[in-house]
């Protein structure tokens, strides 16, 4: 079932499976979101939780304090992208998705949690907020959360990919870990300079 929010500038279509966007169009009908092509990438905008990226052989080991270690299996980018969320409309331009841990999830991720994702249109922008709650006060809950949207680029004729860039809210300086695309693994100990007091990141196919 398609879930639609809109304002005078944008219309966004989403689905309950994975609480993910499936279309972003402007008032001129221009489609901004990648429409999924398995030749390149069949996804569109998955939500990543409780891990981002991959762990070796999909195997995670939990070592809680004063308790035996526990082993679970979590696929690349986590499991909520394959789960159906509940949802409710906040307004014509905003929708909220929620999901809670299930018995099935607890088999491999032994933490009771709730995840709430809200999409809100603000003029020509989409604000996305994430609220993760640990429902077990007696123990810490390790997790990561991320967004993985794909966009059509270029959007218009006579444009090229390199005409586009990402712009951050403020100037950023950071390093990134060594990556291994074939496995999706990262070497967190081997880091390389990436941004140096930059607010914009130019796009390229490297």
List each model region and its residues.
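Acidic, contiguous internal or C-terminal segments within carbohydrate-active enzymes
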Residues: 5, 101-149
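Acidic/His-leaning functional-site neighborhoods
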Residues: 10, 74-88, 194-206
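Hydrophobic residues embedded in beta-strands of well-ordered beta-sheets
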Residues: 3, 22, 94-95, 126-128
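Beta-strand-rich N-terminal accessory domains
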Residues: 1-66
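Beta-strand-rich recognition/accessory modules
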Residues: 1-8, 101-102, 114, 199-206
């Amino acid at each position: 079932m398609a879930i639609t929010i809109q304002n005078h500038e944008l219309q966004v279509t989403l689905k309950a499976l994975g609480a993910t966007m499936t279309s972003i169009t402007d008032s001129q009908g221009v489609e901004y979101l990648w429409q999924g092509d398995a030749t390149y990438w069949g996804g569109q905008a998955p939500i990543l939780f409780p891990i981002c990226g991959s762990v070796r052989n999909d195997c995670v080991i939990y070592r809680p304090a004063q308790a035996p270690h526990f082993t679970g299996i979590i696929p690349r980018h986590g499991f909520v992208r394959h789960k159906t969320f509940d949802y409710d409309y906040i307004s014509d331009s905003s929708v909220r998705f929620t999901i809670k841990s299930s018995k099935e999830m607890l088999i491999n991720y032994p933490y009771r949690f709730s995840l709430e994702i809200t999409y809100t249109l603000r003029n020509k922008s989409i604000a996305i907020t994430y609220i993760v709650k640990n429902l077990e006060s007696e123990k810490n809950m390790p997790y990561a959360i991320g967004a993985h949207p794909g966009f059509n680029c270029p959007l218009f004729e006579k444009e090229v990919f390199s005409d586009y860039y990402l712009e951050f809210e403020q100037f950023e300086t950071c390093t990134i870990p060594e990556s291994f695309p074939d496995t999706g693994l990262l070497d967190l100990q081997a880091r390389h300079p990436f941004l140096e007091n930059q607010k914009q990141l130019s796009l390229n196919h490297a």
